[in-house]
């Protein structure tokens, strides 16, 4: 199979180094922890497949989006899988060393959803084996029967990586 590698080029500060709008699912590697079916784990398409929102994200990227689904807790009994880790990783490394020796890098993305007692982590890796958590969803309140709310649609998450990256990556 052919997988198009996203273009990576040197950029000035304040310029996008890499972006993706999920139009090519081959840019991503999905590990759904042995779960199968559209109702478990990550999927990339233009359809909202989850139980919570039929509308999906109001993304400025248009087209496809990546969506994480874990069963349906509103059914009796609930169908969500327990003790699983779902991962979505870029298929090819994003070479930030192309910035010319600076660690002034931010990771920004749009998201929509809610925190249902689950932890969402954003991780980076220098070697593709060891990952470091650089962000999570603990800044969001839990949405439960006793209160809380979904994220804004879309919610823009921006993570400054300068504190994580070496001075000259």
Pin down the residues of each PLM region:
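Short coil-to-beta strand junction motifs in C2/discoidin
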Residues: 115-121
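Extracellular carbohydrate recognition and processing domains
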Residues: 131-166
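Short beta-strands within extracellular/lumenal beta-sheet-rich domains
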Residues: 75-99, 155-158
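Extended extracellular/luminal ectodomain segments enriched in beta-structured repeat modules
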Residues: 83-85, 94-108, 117, 167-169
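Extracellular glycan-recognition surfaces and repeat-rich motifs
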Residues: 4-76, 136, 148, 152-154
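Short, intrinsically disordered, charge-balanced linker/junction segments flanking boundaries
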Residues: 6, 10, 164-169
């Amino acid at each position: 199979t052919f997988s198009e590698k996203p273009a990576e080029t040197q950029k000035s500060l304040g310029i996008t180094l890499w972006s993706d709008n999920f139009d090519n699912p081959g840019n991503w590697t999905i590990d759904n922890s042995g779960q199968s079916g559209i109702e478990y784990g990550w999927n990339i398409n233009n359809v909202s497949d989850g139980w919570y929102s039929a509308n999906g994200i109001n993304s400025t990227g248009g087209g496809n989006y990546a969506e994480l689904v874990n069963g349906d807790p509103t059914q009796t009994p609930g169908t969500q899988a327990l003790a699983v880790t779902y991962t979505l990783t870029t298929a090819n490394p994003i070479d930030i060393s192309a910035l010319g020796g600076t660690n002034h890098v931010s990771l920004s993305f749009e998201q929509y959803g809610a925190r249902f007692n689950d932890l969402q982590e954003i991780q980076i890796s220098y070697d593709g084996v060891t990952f470091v958590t650089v962000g999570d969803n603990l800044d969001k309140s839990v949405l439960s029967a006793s209160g809380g709310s979904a994220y804004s649609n879309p919610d823009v998450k921006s993570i400054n990586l300068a504190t994580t990256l070496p001075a000259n990556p």
